C-alpha cells in the first residue's frame, strides 16, 4: 500500500475543501491556525502545504525536504518565499479566479457607501432624526462619474462591468494590456498614471 501524502493546511479553508481532503484516503492532513513549533517539526516530511495569508519564510520552506506543492489559497504570493520554493523544486499554485468578483463587488459597495453617505444617513434614521437629512452632506450619483481602474487583470475586468452598469466613464491604466482589450470591454485607456490621477 502506498504511503499517504501528508498535507499541512495553514489557516483554515472552506469546509468543502476540508471535506474533499477527508474524502480522499490517499491523504492525511492537519490544520494549523498559525505557524508554530509543532508545524515547523511536521513540515520536514510533508508533501503539500495549503496556506492563506500567513508568511511562509525561507527557513520553513527550506526545511521541507519532501515538499512538492504550496497551494496559496488566494491570488497573491507575496507571503511565500519564492527563492526557497524554487530551490527545493516545489510548485506554487494560486487560486487565480477565486476572488475577482468578490473584490469588484466590494469596490462597488464602497463606492455606493461613500457616494450615498450611507453611514451618516443610516445613523440619522436609526436615531429617528428624519429631518436631519437637510443638515447632512448631499449624496451624489455614480452615473456619469469618472473612475480610473489601475490594473486591468481579473479584478479590474470584473470591476469595469459593474461600473458600466452604473453608466460610469471608465478609464483604465495598465501598461501590459493593449488598447483593444480595454476598448472591447468599454473602457478608455490612459497611458500616464500621474496624468490620469
Features from the language model and the residues they span:
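An N-terminal-biased, well-structured beta-alpha scaffold segment characteristic
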Residues: 1-93
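Residue-level detector of anion-binding/catalytic polar loops
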Residues: 28, 91, 113, 169, ...
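Short gly/ser/thr-rich secondary-structure transition/capping motifs
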Residues: 28-35, 51-52, 126-134, 183-189
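Structured loop/turn residues at beta-strand edges in well-structured enzyme cores
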Residues: 44, 62-65, 116, 191, ...
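Short low-complexity, flexible loop/linker segments enriched in glycine and/or proline
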Residues: 44-47, 108-111, 185-188
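Phosphate-binding beta-alpha-beta segment of Rossmann-like dinucleotide-binding domains, i.e.
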Residues: 88, 96-146, 158-161
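Rossmann-like dinucleotide/phosphate-binding beta-alpha-beta segment
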Residues: 135-197
Amino acid at each position: 500500500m502506498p504511503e499517504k501524502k501528508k498535507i499541512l493546511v495553514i489557516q483554515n479553508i472552506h469546509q468543502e475543501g476540508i471535506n474533499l481532503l477527508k474524502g480522499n484516503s490517499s491523504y492525511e492532513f492537519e490544520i494549523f491556525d498559525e505557524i508554530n513549533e509543532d508545524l515547523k517539526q511536521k513540515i520536514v516530511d510533508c508533501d503539500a502545504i495549503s496556506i492563506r495569508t500567513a508568511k511562509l519564510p525561507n527557513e520553513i520552506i527550506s526545511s521541507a525536504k519532501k515538499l512538492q506543492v504550496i497551494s496559496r489559497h488566494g491570488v497573491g504570493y507575496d507571503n511565500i518565499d519564492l527563492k526557497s520554493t524554487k530551490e527545493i523544486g516545489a510548485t506554487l499554485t494560486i487560486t487565480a479566479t477565486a476572488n475577482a468578483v468578490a473584490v469588484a463587488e466590494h469596490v462597488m459597495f464602497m463606492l455606493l457607501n461613500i457616494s450615498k453617505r450611507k453611514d451618516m444617513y443610516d445613523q440619522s434614521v436609526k436615531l429617528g432624526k428624519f429631518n436631519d437629512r437637510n443638515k447632512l452632506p448631499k449624496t451624489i450619483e455614480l452615473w456619469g462619474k469618472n473612475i480610473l481602474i489601475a490594473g486591468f487583470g481579473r479584478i479590474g475586468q470584473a470591476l469595469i462591468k459593474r461600473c458600466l452598469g452604473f453608466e460610469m466613464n471608465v478609464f483604465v491604466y495598465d501598461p501590459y494590456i493593449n488598447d483593444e482589450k480595454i476598448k472591447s470591454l468599454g473602457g478608455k485607456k490612459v497611458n500616464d498614471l500621474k496624468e490620469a490621477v
